[in-house]
Amino acid sequence: LPAPSFSIRVHQNTPDEFLYRACEVTRLGLGVPAMYNDEVIIPALCNRGVSLADARSYCIIGCVEPQCPHKTEGWHDAAFFNIAKVLEITLNNGKVGDKQLGPQTGDMTSFTSIEDIFAAYKKQMEYFVYHLAEADNCVDFAHAERAPLPFLSALVDDCIGRGKSVQEGGAIYNFTGPQAFGVAD
């Protein structure tokens, strides 16, 4: 993989010449630059409670996660969630082998339409997302108690003022997000 990662932010007023040059680099096949659409990301951050000024100053961390520099505690790999496995569980009435892991939502032979499958899948997803959030919350509490990260907290806005580490929710913005996988691009 090319390192360091290189990315650009684009919007409706991005100069054509700049986009043309970025596409020339992309054509080399190295996966760079990654392109991030301000017209999607800024409203999405505002929808999560980020001020417009902070949303406009977002940067990308990790692979693809937008956050506000010096203001965000983002645990972006909080879990790896296999959504294809949830489909398998759905098609087997909540079972994997002989173990009942999810709720009983009907055997696949009883489904008469794609809507039936989707309704069962939605129930399974609700069940597993609930348990995923509960598990992530437990880890959040353990991190706050056992790994407060004082040096990092001193570098993130509002932690000192609030008297809380980043692990305790001291940052202005606190996000936890699992990675969904098992899906085709």
Which ranges hold each PLM region?
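Conserved catalytic cores of very large enzyme subunits
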Residues: 1-185
